[in-house]
Amino acid sequence: MGKLQEVLKHPDELVPLMQMLVSDYYTKIVPRDPGLGFCYRMLNKVSRSFAIVIQQLPELLRDPICVFYLVLRALDTVEDDMALPNDIKLPLLRAFHKKIYDRKWSMKCGYGPYVQLMEEYPMVTGVFLKLDPGPREVITEICRKMGAGMAEFIPKEVLTVKDYDQYCHYAAGLVGEGLSKLAVGSGLENPVLLQKEDLSNHMGLFLQKTNIVRDYLEDINEEPAPRMFWPKEIWGKYTKDLADFKDPANEKGAVQCLNHMVTDALRHGEHALKYMALLRDPQYFNFCAIPQVMAFGTLSLCYNNPQVFKGVVKLRKGESAKLMTTVKSMPALYRTFLRMADDMVARCKGEARQDPNVATTLKRLQAIQAVCKTGLRSSIKSRKKQAATPLSDDFISKLVLVLGLGYCVYAFNLLPLLWKSALIPGPPPPALTSSLGLPHQIIAVFCVLTAGYQVFLRGGLA
């Protein structure tokens, strides 16, 4: 009942939700190869949202990135397992990149689906060893750097913002570097990405910091003793103990610290947009853009929100689906980021106007707005060229809408009515007077809604 109420409150999310259901169905169709089948089943278990975007990648990239993700999730499982003593964990993190070449290596650690990933790790190894040498080298190199970085931070706290940036570089910035190398190595992406490691690093930090901000309560309540990544340089300005933010009596300081953390994460947004503006493969673009827009949406939701210290804060499924289906091009991504930035600016000038960091928050948001506005202006000429092309996306969307409307007329047996309204003498031919039945009517309505929604996103029928 709750989900139905959500849909009724946000009817514009219905079509994206239906599209996401279709995408979700296809993620469950795994390859027949036992090794690849295991990898894609595990991918669905450890990250449904990531499974959806990986399945949309070009074939050249799909399997290497799936394996890349699982290798790094396994490494992350070792890092996160607080039951592993450091004398075992540290050498393992530093040597983990070598385990991917050992067909027999596995271990028991982690929790939930990660237990199966670690126990059946040879299945991942088998697929990895079948990859071309180029992807294998990239995965090995990034795993080596990440493992060494994680080992560096196991015995020490994240004290400064510089420490925070460095840890997030190891945990996620290196992922961006590896993805760029895989994409360029496949021949699908712009070689200039290899010269823009700073931008790919910002992509990773934007995602990682969003997760760290959002997961405060889950992380602080972890047993045994939790590892926290909020830098003391920030939280030390608002409390003597990071755990104090769980106490409702400390809500004011907690929210101020939260806003400070969100503001820090926002500095990566403009650079993430600059990275994505360099991409040329549409499927790889979607793969990169969807997590970034979800991260910005989550940061916006967390900003000035005391619920972060009380429970789960996440985007509605319909809202997530709408975001995932709207960012199909750079102009669409600019518009979405600009809308979110505008919303946050309004809140900074309203509900959060007394926040001690509001001036810096506004500065970061204005930087994002500037990149979006500049990008949209520069895309006007290319959009006009695209509109003049007979087979542009706009043309196809409108064509599908017209065909869908025709299908609706036929499926609902409306042709006799149109025949009479057109003042055509005589009855319509028998072939035009039969209804196709409920299944066809449902499909026809879905086609019209989907095509109509895409036409609306692209600026209407004009």
From Swiss-Prot:
NADP(+) binds at R48, R73, R214, K314, R316. Its EC number is 2.5.1.21. InterPro entries: Isoprenoid_synthase_dom_sf (IPR008949), Squ/phyt_synthse (IPR002060), Squal_synth-like (IPR006449), Squalene/phytoene_synthase_CS (IPR019845), Trans_IPPS_euk-type (IPR044844), Trans_IPPS_HH (IPR033904). It comes from the Eukaryota. Keywords: Magnesium, Membrane, Metal-binding, NAD, NADP, Transferase, Transmembrane, Transmembrane helix. One of its GO terms (biological process) is farnesyl diphosphate metabolic process. It is found in: Membrane. GO terms for molecular function: metal ion binding; squalene synthase [NAD(P)H] activity. It catalyses: 2 (2E,6E)-farnesyl diphosphate + NADH + H(+) = squalene + 2 diphosphate + NAD(+); 2 (2E,6E)-farnesyl diphosphate + NADPH + H(+) = squalene + 2 diphosphate + NADP(+). Mg(2+) binds at D76, E79, D80. The chain crosses the membrane at residues 399-419, 436-456. Belongs to the phytoene/squalene synthase family. Converts farnesyl diphosphate (FPP) into squalene, a precursor for sterol biosynthesis in eukaryotes. This is Squalene synthase LSS.
